[in-house]
Amino acid sequence: MQFSKMHGLGNDFVVVDGVTQNVFFTPETIRRLANRHCGIGFDQLLIVEAPYDPELDFHYRIFNADGSEVSQCGNGARCFARFVTLKGLTNKKDISVSTQKGNMVLTVKDDNQIRVNMGEPIWEPAKIPFTANKFEKNYILRTDIQTVLCGAVSMGNPHCVVQVDDIQTANVEQLGPLLESHERFPERVNAGFMQIINKEHIKLRVYERGAGETQACGSGACAAVAVGIMQGLLNNNVQVDLSGGSLMIEWNGVGHPLYMTGEATHIYDGFITL
């Protein structure tokens, strides 16, 4: 099997062309390949497939390192766009793709930046999914070690966002797993820890569902900004600093799509026998 190793701000991926080669992965195979000592090593496996809808260009599948399939990965979407361009699978600048939960448009810019239309944030608890009687800007979540206020939103995958004073001292290692598996998120959740620098600048750490803390999480950056805007804490254009680098997030509020812009880096191509 041919593959490419790529990363978006340090969030690393193996990307596989499922258009020109036949590929099939069991959860066990994915876990073996994801092992950084005995396999290739990655946060997520991305598969490019032929479109399910003839009006679109591709179908986009995402698997976490634990073998579970998920519906969205923002950093992966940028790498997906870079991959299909580099491999000559398309020459379009605006690339339309479907995912498990909806469609996206990926725009390849001339400065190595990829702009992703992430669609509208989803706030209705049942659609996140999140257990709550109604939408609120803040929810109280109780864990074994701490009670927190969080915003909850779906960007095609579920996110909770907790505001902290300092992301360097935030208890991500202990609180992250407890939030990820919290009973009020029946499909588990990506837990974001957001430090607000000013209305146009935040710092963020994300404990990802099925992957643990990563260098960057694109959909997590989108979720954090969306929550911050809904809570009246942020403006419409926000720089998000993650440990792997920065993203620009734009959102004009309810009824509008959210946009993420950032880099996508090709590291190397390889071949492995499954």
Swiss-Prot record:
Keyword Manganese found: no
Signal peptide span: none
Instruction: Give its E.C. classification number.
Output: 5.1.1.7
- Reaction(s) this enzyme catalyzes, per UniProt: (2S,6S)-2,6-diaminopimelate = meso-2,6-diaminopimelate
- For the protein in the UniProt heading, the enzyme class is isomerase
Where is this protein primarily located?
cytoplasm
> Where along this sequence does the record place binding of substrate?
N11, Q44, N64, G74, N75, N157, N190, E208, R209, G218, S219
Q: Where in the cell is it found?
A: Cytoplasm
Q: What keywords does the record list, in alphabetical order?
A: Amino-acid biosynthesis, Cytoplasm, Isomerase, Lysine biosynthesis
- Which Gene3D superfamilies does the record cross-reference, listed alphabetically? Diaminopimelate Epimerase, Chain A, domain 1
Can the keyword Isomerase be found in this entry's annotation? yes
Quote the catalytic residue positions. C73, C217
CC terms in the record's Gene Ontology section: cytosol
* Site feature: Important for dimerization: Y268
Site (Could be important to modulate the pK values of the two catalytic cysteine residues) at H159, E208
Q: In which pathway does it act?
A: Amino-acid biosynthesis; L-lysine biosynthesis via DAP pathway; DL-2,6-diaminopimelate from LL-2,6-diaminopimelate: step 1/1
Q: Its Gene Ontology biological processes?
A: lysine biosynthetic process via diaminopimelate
Write down the InterPro entries for this protein, in alphabetical order: DAP_epimerase_AS, DAP_epimerase_DapF
Q: Name one GO molecular function term.
A: diaminopimelate epimerase activity
Name the job this protein performs.
Answer: Catalyzes the stereoinversion of LL-2,6-diaminopimelate (L,L-DAP) to meso-diaminopimelate (meso-DAP), a precursor of L-lysine and an essential component of the bacterial peptidoglycan.
What NCBIfam families does the record tag this protein with?
Answer: DapF
The family line of this record is: Belongs to the diaminopimelate epimerase family.
List the PANTHER family hit by this protein, alphabetically: DIAMINOPIMELATE EPIMERASE, DIAMINOPIMELATE EPIMERASE, CHLOROPLASTIC
Question: This protein is called what?
Answer: Diaminopimelate epimerase
Q: Which organism is it from?
A: Haemophilus influenzae (strain PittGG)
